[in-house]
Amino acid sequence: MAGGIELAKKAIRSLKNYDEHENRYGSIFSVSGPVVVAANMLGCSMYELVRVGHEELVGEVIRIHQDKCTIQVYEETSGLTVGDPVQRTGKPLSVELGPGLAETIYDGIQRPLKQIFDKSQSIYIPRGINTESLNREHKWDFTPNKDLRIGDHVSGGDVFGSVFENSLFNDHKIMLPPRARGTVTYIAEAGSYHVDEKLLEVEFNGKKHSFSMLHTWPVRAARPVADNLTANQPLLTGQRVLDALYPCVQGGTTAIPGAFGCGKTVISQSLSKYSNSDLIVYVGCGERGNEMAEVLMDFPELTIDINGKPEPIMKRTTLVANTSNMPVAAREASIYTGITLAEYYRDQGKNVSMMADSTSRWAEALREISGRLAEMPADSGYPAYLGAKLASFYERAGRARCLGSPDREGTVSIVGAVSPPGGDFSDPVTSATLGIVQVFWGLDKKLAQRKHFPSINTSLSYSKYINALQPWYEERVPGFNTLRDQIKQIIQQEDSMLEIIQLVGKSALSETDKVTLDIAGIIKNDFLQQNGYSDYDRCCPLYKTYHMMRNMIAYYTKAKSAVETGSVPWSKIKESTSDIFYELTSMKFENPNEGEKEIVEHYETLHKKIEDKFHTLTE
């Protein structure tokens, strides 16, 4: 009798297992480009990861209706047929977070491109390929947290050890996942471990949980923080026009809209190369593959000095490449993949910059998928929720106090390039972006055609962070804010004068206006313009920017006051100070590699020369 009951229980268990196995599979009902409808999918959840077809293509559930669900597939769907199996995974689209992220190039759903190439020996990504995001073969030197003991209580975000990843990222903190907690029952000793080996075991409610160096996190969910803080440190870019006139903060949001050929990618790349961020996440979203190839070729050659030793900046960079010839649906995921990686770095207590090039291509991917779903189109065919999607992405930027102990602060700055068709800033993507971001670096097609780079339009661009940054500038660079206001004023005055000159000619201007016009010419041609491909000017440190501004404004102030007294006309001043005028135009040629002290001395000498010359002129 007892044996019969046991057999019955065993049969019920096997039937349950069979049902569960059967419930994990649906079948394809229809295929429309990257959008697949699957039937018999009862129990699946929104944004669940699924495997589509016999090749197990990666897809994500984006709509559920009765037992049917709509899936966006992140790979080429040609060859799928009605009736092919659809396997549920029971988890959302997630990324792996841990040592090995830096120096790696991923596709839009965090598949490492180098490993895929080594595995397939093809320049194209094979369909359905499944590789681990983090290298399971490599061993990392783990150092446990010396303050952690068995029996201690830990919660999400607590650092239980660290790993030396590379010379630019030498303190990769190993943290408890944000939602984990418990009492420590085991912690590994110092040594070399693979990313998936058990390093920590905690007990909570009688259940034991093991943790390794890596953990996963769903890309569409923002990582939690202990507190959001006000950003008050500048994101220094090395571009004079941006640092001086339209600064951004670490933890800020910036848009760079501009037509084709205006230099959006060059600005994004120079930010990645020279900004004062600790780590960079560069997302190439729907742009040309050559641009990502350029990044891969340039970055290993570019170096920054760490303790007197040059290190390639690739060591602080993670690339997410989703070029225009890759499947459209993966563009949408690539932005979320990039921001999740950036948030993980922020939780390390780092200042992170994320470049999204370009959010317009991401919006176009949304439009295509929205059209396939037969949703009601809004302006220019974009979905009605475009603004909400953009806002939810940009809102993940900011400065925050991280979860767990020890206390640490980190920032995520987002710089989004926008490519409006024909450079039209009334485009829905540009309009929606401008309502969200705090800094607007507008690029001008006419300036780009005149080979004036960076082609920032000074009358269109703005920054809402200037007031927040004033205390920082006053403390470290006294007088910087006043110089900025004076330079902006000169540029605005010149813009209004140009209309008068076109009507009545330059001779009709007053003497003070002639001074303003000539100094504005120096500011525009020799200060705002910058050669990104030269040693001396590709990156301009803040001290160089400040002294250039100081000397130009000193000359302007002295010349203007001399002209206003009526003692000397501007033409005579310009003639007698022609050597100083030439030196003002040549200030940009000072190479920062020569050292700060030497350059500052040169600028100070020029400043004294200006004062002495005008003193003798006005006597």
UniProtKB/Swiss-Prot annotation:
Residues bound to ATP: 258-265
Keywords: ATP-binding, Hydrogen ion transport, Ion transport, Membrane, Nucleotide-binding, Translocase, Transport, Vacuole
Major localization class: membrane
Subunit structure: V-ATPase is a heteromultimeric enzyme composed of a peripheral catalytic V1 complex (components A to H) attached to an integral membrane V0 proton pore complex (components: a, c, c', c'', d, e, f and VOA1).
Enzymatic reactions: ATP + H2O + 4 H(+)(in) = ADP + phosphate + 5 H(+)(out)
Protein name (record): V-type proton ATPase catalytic subunit A
Function: Catalytic subunit of the V1 complex of vacuolar(H+)-ATPase (V-ATPase), a multisubunit enzyme composed of a peripheral complex (V1) that hydrolyzes ATP and a membrane integral complex (V0) that translocates protons. V-ATPase is responsible for acidifying and maintaining the pH of intracellular compartments.
